[in-house]
Amino acid sequence: MKTARRRSRELAVQAVYQSLINRTAAPEIAKNIREMPDFAKADEELFNKLFFGTQTNAAEYIRQIRPLLDRDEKDLNPIERAVLLTACHELSAMPETPYPVIINEAIEVTKTFGGTDGHKFVNGILDKLAAQIRPDEPKRR
C-alpha cells in the first residue's frame, strides 16, 4: 500500500515530467494533477512543495546534476530527469527528510515509471548529489 507521501512524490514527478514534455504552465499542470483520482490519497502540501519548488529552481538543479552524469544531459530519459530534479529539490529544500529516505523514494518512483535499469542510474546520481548537498548529514544506510 502506498503512503500519501509516496503518492505525492509520484504525482510531483508526473507533473515535472509533463512540464518537461509539454511546456505547459505549472498552475495548469497542477490543476490537471489535482483532478486525478490518486490525488485524493496524496499529501497536497508535499505535492505543492515538490512540484512548485522544482519548477522554480530547475535551472539550478540541472547545474548541480549535470557534472554527475555519465552521458550528455540531452540523452537523459525524461522520467529520469523528472525524478532527479524532484529529488534534488527535496534534498536541497527539505532537510527534515533524511536523504536515504529521499533516495529510496526516488528509486521506487523510478521503478514505477522508468525504464528497466533507470532506478540504478538514479540511485548512483542521487548518492553523489546527496554527498554534495548534505555533506554533514550522517550516512544512515
Swiss-Prot record:
GO terms for molecular function: RNA binding. Keywords: RNA-binding, Transcription, Transcription antitermination, Transcription regulation. GO terms for cellular component: cytosol. Transmembrane segments: none annotated. Gene3D superfamilies: NusB-like (1.10.940.10). It comes from the Bacteria. The keyword S-adenosyl-L-methionine does not apply. Involved in transcription antitermination. Required for transcription of ribosomal RNA (rRNA) genes. Binds specifically to the boxA antiterminator sequence of the ribosomal RNA (rrn) operons. NCBIfam families: nusB. This is Transcription antitermination protein NusB. It comes from Neisseria meningitidis serogroup A / serotype 4A (strain DSM 15465 / Z2491).
